[in-house]
């Protein structure tokens, strides 16, 4: 079975840090924040095997560009599968306007 190299963009890392900070500092739940951060990180790392298991997004032009979405609790991990690499672009709260936030990063 093919194994991919998983790369996380600076923006996606920042997204994860903001998720942690919000839960730890605003909601005053540091243990919950660490657990959520770890679940997202583990899910991202699992993309090294069978990254195509998650669906392409439904919106265009992101779908044509190969952007995929993986759900982790209440968060969406957006990534693109390349020849040997999985590139994680964003990690966003799923209840937000995902299309608008995805397009804002361009």
Label each residue range with its predicted role.
Residues 1-63:
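Basic, Lys/Arg-enriched alpha-helical interface segments
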Residues 4, 9, 59-60, 70-74, ...:
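Surface-exposed loop/turn and secondary-structure junction residues enriched for glycine/proline
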Residues 7, 39, 53, 68, ...:
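Basic side chains
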Residues 27, 72-76, 80-106:
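Enriched for short, Lys/Arg-rich terminal
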Residues 38-49, 66-73, 96-97, 105:
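Alpha-helix boundary/capping detector
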Residues 50, 54-85:
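Basic/aromatic recognition patch in beta-strand/loop cores that engages polyanionic ligands
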